[in-house]
Design a protein with these regions (language model features):
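Karyopherin-beta/Importin-beta family HEAT-repeat alpha-solenoid scaffold
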Residues: 1-956
Length: 956
């Protein structure tokens, strides 16, 4: 907001409009105006005035929120000599407004906490606050609020206070932690039966536990710990207080993850949590789900904390396996939300046990995992009155998917085959309800792929078995059947045979899940090809029924992927399905999956048949595109070609026949015939980014399919790309250009044409990025531009390095290093790394000296700027996950010329700010020299990365 300060009356009107204007557009205008006000320098004074006047809750909340935001993001706007008066003003406001609204108190508490963290001159802020307000009972609630949010804000990403200041703060808070605990004890004594005060005490204590500054020996014998468990054991405790106490215990458990250094507190927490089993059962009996969930959270955190002990010393001391019993008790609760809380622990347990690879240890945990799996199978049961197929996108469907993932991760402890056989035996014994059958089949489907069809497993198999309660008889002769059993695993074969013979009268959900199971058992089908016909017949029945069609299509896709050679004889059948694809009620993903499976089988046909078959497979989609091109746009008729483009793309992507050198690619003729249709489609929809993206994707896989066999398309394709891109800057053209460079960049006759393409594409690209916030608004363009440039460096480095466009591209790469976008930043860093690496790579090749010279010229011109920018972006712009990529670029620069890099890095370090605007030390001279030495003496890239991680923390 530029210009003069707005009047308070105008601000009040905007706040009123934001909360009370019945017109949504009025609310939107008010929100925008107030947002501009918050970003202006006038916000400080206006917020202070609004808080003084206290006209209404809405204006006070806006002012408190604004004050917090300004302190977090714009503290540098204030002169240092105004900080003390701001502090005093905020403390006055929170005292005056303490009874108006809890959310206002929280916002002001955050503002005070953030101010304290950024104000080095406010020494011992905890002691100051406690001395000032602890004797006034009415001030205790907001005092506790400040002391709660203060530790929480220490690691806030909104505050870039740096590691040095953060360390200073943590040491200060640790020093005064006993003062805070004493205050909390006083509050408990004064609280009596005041539940709200107790909740604030527990929240505050949990916050200090989370920061890790409480003395564990002191806390082990503290009355607050005993009070926590007393509250959790009492049946009469309210839900809100119970949740606050539970959160606090979880925070305490999290804080002692390093058990050995916190042994006294660890023992107290361990014993305390074990006493909560009775309280859990009482909560179950009272059907108090909130408390049940709280107990499960505590039990899970207990197991997470003592995981190392549980795995290394199971059944001994803190490795007591009663912890697992508590989780299995929770797994027995009828609500699936309860067991779901513990999933992360079970994942971690499985990971630890997998790494130990100790059969004796594994044997100890096997029974626990078996019990867990049986509980999970029960939780996966649908309601008996459920109709239709299982939902996969609702909460319960997502829970089942998480169960499936967990089972896959834990199955190694039981043994896939043993578990599969156990589950199967539960279905053979008796006549279980349909929902039990479906859930067991679901778990079997989760582990089917991990079952080795070659591994023998002894289990009694009766030829006339009762499968799932239905009598089945094999059409295979006894002799043939016994032969199969001798060669393969009997359980797998019997399951497969039983599933494909399920009567159509069973519940739709059972059929649906059995189809999924068949799809997961594709390796068994591959080893038992005599089952292929009945399996395909079974899946075709499902394909013809709307509820089952997509699952059946996915299963057929799986069969095609694994049984490609056996499926070749069924290609004509697949072709018929593909021709009538839209007659089946398939999801778009399932339809594409079917075509993928068909293409995989097509690639296994004899080369002389592939051309004709591919043409047949593509013809339906091509005819549909032609029809769309010929019709005039009209209301009610879709002219969207993306469905057919996606289908062609998947066909091209997965038709990968083995073609010997000198042979004409069998797909070449078909793609050349289809090109005019794709070209016309692209031209018609040139302004529609979504459709153009699908066109480019289709062309990308067409080019990849035939490789250099697409040479005839190169000239017309590049011409059309450049022409359209000059009018409509769809970044997918840059990506498609990178594919062309990858395929043809090493062909001498194509290099100049590809360079011309790059230069032509760069002109509108640079114009786009030069716009205001161009990099931030067009990250996809940045991503694809540097993919294209990287391909050039990889395939024809000298061509690019000699060109006039290399310096502008590098300048844009340097500018783009600040872009906080994962994919775009990764592409930029990869380009920089590969560009510089060109100067040292493949020194045996004849163009090495030329490459080395050209890279030297580029680095002499822009090397210092690049190093300075990389250091700046690491410290101030990019998240930590980008540091390995930056380290690789710095490492490559060092490999080219280490002495020069040392100078560049030294100059860059001199340009960094050494203090914050309020005088706090950001980085010391020793820290600068240590970092310089660590980087320049590094013998591996990972050492550069480690040094960067530590150094950049000083500025975060």
């Amino acid at each position: 907001m530029e210009g003069a300060k707005p009047t308070l009356q105008l601000v009040y009107q905007a706040v009123q409009a934001l909360y009370h204007d019945p017109d949504p557009s009025g609310k939107e205008r008010a929100s925008f105006w107030l947002g501009e006000l918050q970003r202006s320098v006038h916000a400080w004074e206006i917020s202070d005035q609004l808080l003084q006047i206290r006209q209404d809750v809405e204006s006070c909340y806006f002012a408190a929120q604004t004050m917090k935001m300004k302190i977090q993001t714009s503290f540098y706007e204030l002169p240092t000599d105004s900080h003390a008066s701001l502090r005093d003003s905020l403390l006055t406001h929170i005292q005056n407004l303490k009874d108006l609204s809890p959310v206002i108190v929280t916002q002001l508490a955050l503002a005070i906490a953030d101010l304290a963290l950024q104000m080095p001159s406010w020494k011992g802020c905890v002691q100051t606050l406690v001395e000032k307000y602890s004797n006034d009972v009415t001030s205790l609630p907001f005092l506790l609020e400040i002391l709660t949010v203060l530790p929480e804000e220490v690691h806030s990403r909104s505050l870039r206070i740096g590691a040095n200041r953060r360390t200073e703060i943590i040491e200060d808070l640790a020093f005064y932690s006993s003062t805070v605990v004493s205050l909390l004890m006083t509050c408990v004594e004064k609280a009596g039966t005041d539940e709200k005060m107790l909740m604030k005490v527990f929240r505050c204590l949990g916050s200090w536990f989370n920061l890790g500054v409480l003395d564990s020996n002191f806390m082990a014998n503290n009355k607050l710990l005993a009070l926590l468990f007393e509250v959790l054991q009492q049946d009469k405790t309210s839900s809100n207080l119970h949740e606050a106490a539970s959160d606090c215990v979880c925070s305490a458990l999290y804080a002692i993850e390093n058990v050995e250094t916190n042994l006294p507190l660890a023992m107290q927490l361990f014993q305390g949590v074990l006493t909560l089993e009775t309280a859990y059962h009482m909560a179950v009996a009272r059907e108090d789900l909130d408390k049940v969930l709280n107990y499960c959270r505590i039990f899970t955190e207990l197991c997470e904390t003592f995981l190392e002990k549980i795995v290394c010393t199971p059944g001994q001391g803190l490795g007591d396996l009663r912890t697992l019993e508590l989780l299995l008790i929770c797994a027995g609760h009828p609500q699936y939300e309860v067991v779901e809380i513990s999933f992360n622990f079970w994942y971690r347990l499985g990971e630890h046990l997998y790494k130990t690879n100790d059969e004796v240890i594994h044997g100890i945990f096997k029974a626990y995992i078996q019990r867990l799996l049986h509980a999970l199978a029960r939780h996966c049961q649908l309601e008996p009155d459920h109709e239709g197929v299982p939902e996969e996108t609702d909460d319960f469907g997502e829970f089942r998917m998480r169960v499936s993932d967990l089972v896959k991760d834990l199955i190694f402890l039981i043994g896939s085959m043993e578990c599969f056989a156990q589950l199967y035996s539960t279905l053979k014994e008796g006549n279980p309800p349909w929902e039990v059958t479906e859930a067991v089949l679901f778990i079997m489907a989760a582990i089917a792929k991990s079952v080795d069809p070659k591994k023998p497993f002894s289990i009694a198999v009766c030829h006339h078995s009762l499968l799932f309660g239905w009598n089945i008889t094999s059409e295979i002769s006894n002799c043939e059947y016994l032969s199969v059993l001798r060669e393969n695993n009997p359980t797998l074969v019997e399951v497969l045979e039983g599933v494909v013979r399920l009567p159509e009268t069973v519940h739709t959900a059972v059929r649906y899940t059995s189809i999924e199971l068949v799809g997961e058992m594709s390796e068994v089908v591959d080893r038992n090809p005599q089952f292929l016909d009945p399996v395909l017949g079974y899946l075709m029945k499902g394909l013809c029924e709307k509820p089952l069609a997509s699952a059946a299509a996915k299963a057929i896709h799986n069969i095609c992927s694994v049984c490609r050679d056996h499926m070749a004889q069924h290609f004509n059948g697949l072709l018929e399905i593909a021709r009538s694809l839209d007659s089946f009620m398939l999801s778009p993903e399932a339809a594409v999956g079917l075509l993928k499976g068909t293409a995989l089988v097509l690639a296994r046909l004899p080369l002389d048949k592939i051309t004709e078959c591919l043409s047949e497979l593509c013809s339906v989609q091509v005819m549909a595109l032609k029809k769309l091109l010929s019709q005039e746009p009209s209301n009610g008729i879709s002219s969207d070609p993306t469905v057919f483009l996606d289908r062609l793309a998947v066909i091209f992507r997965h038709t990968n026949p083995i073609v010997e050198n000198g042979q004409t690619h069998p797909c070449q003729k078909v793609i050349q015939e289809i090109w005019p249709v794709l070209s016309e489609t692209l031209n018609k929809h040139r302004a529609d980014n979504r459709i153009v993206e699908r066109c480019c994707r289709c062309l990308r896989f067409a080019v990849r399919c035939v490789g250099k066999g697409s040479a005839a398309l190169l000239q017309p394709l590049v011409t059309q790309m450049v022409n359209v891109y000059h009018v409509h800057q769809h970044s997918c053209f840059l990506y498609l250009g990178s594919i062309l460079v990858d395929e043809y960049g090493m062909e001498e006759g194509c290099r100049q044409g590809l360079l011309d393409m790059l230069q032509a594409l760069c002109i509108p690209t640079f114009q786009l990025l030069e716009q205001q916030n161009g990099l931030q608004n067009h990250p996809d363009t940045v991503d694809d531009l540097f993919r294209l440039a990287t391909r050039f460096i990889q395939r024809s480095p000298v061509t690019l390095l000699r060109s006039q466009v290399v310096i502008p591209i590098l300048q844009w790469a340097i500018a783009s290093t600040t872009l906080d976008h994962r994919d775009a930043n990764c592409s930029v860093m990869r380009f920089l790394r590969d560009l510089i690496h060109t100067g040292v790579a493949n020194d045996h090749e004849e163009d090495f000296e030329l490459r080395k010279e050209l890279i030297g010229q580029v680095m002499n011109q822009l090397g210092q700027q690049l190093v300075s920018q990389l250091l700046h972006t690491c410290c101030f712009c990019l998240p930590p996950y980008t540091l390995p990529d930056v380290a690789e670029v710095l490492w490559e620069i060092m490999q080219v010329d280490r002495p020069t890099f040392c100078r560049w890095l030294e100059n860059s370090l001199k340009g960094l700010p050494k203090e914050t605007t309020v005088g706090a030390v950001t980085v010391t001279h020793k820290q600068l020299t240590d970092f310089h030495k660590q980087v320049t003496s590094a013998e591996e890239c990972k050492q550069v990365c480690w040094a960067l991680r530590d150094f950049t923390r000083l500025f975060r």
